[in-house]
Structures are given as structure tokens and as C-alpha cells.
């Protein structure tokens, strides 16, 4: 189940993650807010899954870009429920080497047809729109080291039954949950 997989991923973090990311932030040209710095420094310290919650305009996609650039040498997959959301990620994420972008249904269909690839890090945007069924299928098919789940719990919900994104926060260490609250656009 979704919760079982999330709990397994949350059992341990990436060794020396916090120190490495602090060094990257100190030497980066990005003007990263304190809110995002704190989240970046802890998100994978105790877990291999991290969740980013935030309303529209709080900088979730910008934050995805920071994470992507920190992990720029790694293979990355960006998923979203809709094609417009996938295209938005393509436009706004600058870490373009070894990246793939697609809808979660396209990913699930490809992998059901045995086109398998291992990724270092997978990002799923607009998680509140992904149904329990699609997420369960994704978790059964995907091969990855790190998982970043991004969304707005106030956004339109999944058309099919999908409460997993709101529920998983209770199964993660506090350091793996990032709640973006400061609005950057209105």
C-alpha cells in the first residue's frame, strides 16, 4: 500500500545530506529564502521521501528547481497529473541534464509495458490530483532512490478517490515535511 511504502522510505535518510546541502547553499548563486534553506537542509536528513506542501504562489516549483540543481549530477524524473503541469515543470526547472518529464499515467503505462529505468530522484507535482490507485501503481512500478512529493492540499482534488497526499504527513519525520507558507505571487 501507499502508506507502507512511504513508511519504508522514511526509515532512514541520506548520509551527510545536511552538511552537503549547507555547503551547496553557501556556494550557490541562488537567493534562497530562509524558509526554503531550512527545508532544503533537512528534507533528506532522516528520510528518502520528502513532502512539500504549499498553496499556489508559495514557490513550490522554484523549490523543485533548487532541489534539482543540488542533485544536478543525478538522473531525475518529473511527473505530474496533467500535461499543462508537466509543461510548467519543463519551463521552470533549469537542471536539464539527465531529466525526463511526463504525466504519471504515461509513466505507469510505459512501465507496465516493461520499459524500465532506474532514477536517482523522482518528483511528483500536483500530488493532490493523483488518485490512490495511480499512486499505488506508481510506487509498485517505479525504481528510484529519492522521492519528492509536491502539492497543495487546497487544490482541486483527484477525480477518482485520492486522500493519500493529505494522509502521508502523519507517517514522515518532521524534517521530511516542508510547508511553504510565504506567498511570492498573488
Where on the chain are the PLM-derived regions?
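Conserved ATP-binding/catalytic motifs of P-loop helicase motor domains
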Residues: 1-186
Amino acid at each position: 500500500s501507499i502508506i507502507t511504502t512511504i513508511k519504508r522510505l522514511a526509515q532512514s535518510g541520506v548520509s551527510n545530506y545536511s552538511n552537503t546541502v549547507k555547503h551547496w547553499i553557501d556556494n550557490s548563486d541562488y537567493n534562497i529564502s530562509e524558509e526554503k534553506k531550512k527545508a532544503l537542509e533537512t528534507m533528506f536528513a532522516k528520510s528518502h521521501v520528502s513532502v512539500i506542501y504549499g498553496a499556489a504562489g508559495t514557490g513550490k516549483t522554484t523549490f523543485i528547481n533548487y532541489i534539482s540543481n543540488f542533485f544536478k549530477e543525478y538522473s531525475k524524473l518529473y511527473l505530474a497529473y496533467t500535461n499543462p503541469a508537466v509543461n510548467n515543470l519543463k519551463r521552470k526547472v533549469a537542471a536539464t541534464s539527465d531529466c525526463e518529464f511526463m504525466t504519471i499515467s504515461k509513466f505507469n503505462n510505459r512501465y507496465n509495458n516493461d520499459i524500465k529505468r532506474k532514477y536517482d530522484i523522482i518528483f511528483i507535482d500536483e500530488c493532490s490530483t493523483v488518485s490512490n490507485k495511480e499512486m499505488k501503481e506508481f510506487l509498485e512500478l517505479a525504481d528510484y532512490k529519492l522521492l519528492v512529493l509536491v502539492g497543495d492540499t487546497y487544490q482541486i482534488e483527484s477525480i477518482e478517490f485520492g486522500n493519500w497526499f493529505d494522509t502521508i504527513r502523519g507517517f514522515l519525520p518532521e524534517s521530511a515535511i516542508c510547508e511553504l507558507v510565504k506567498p511570492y505571487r498573488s
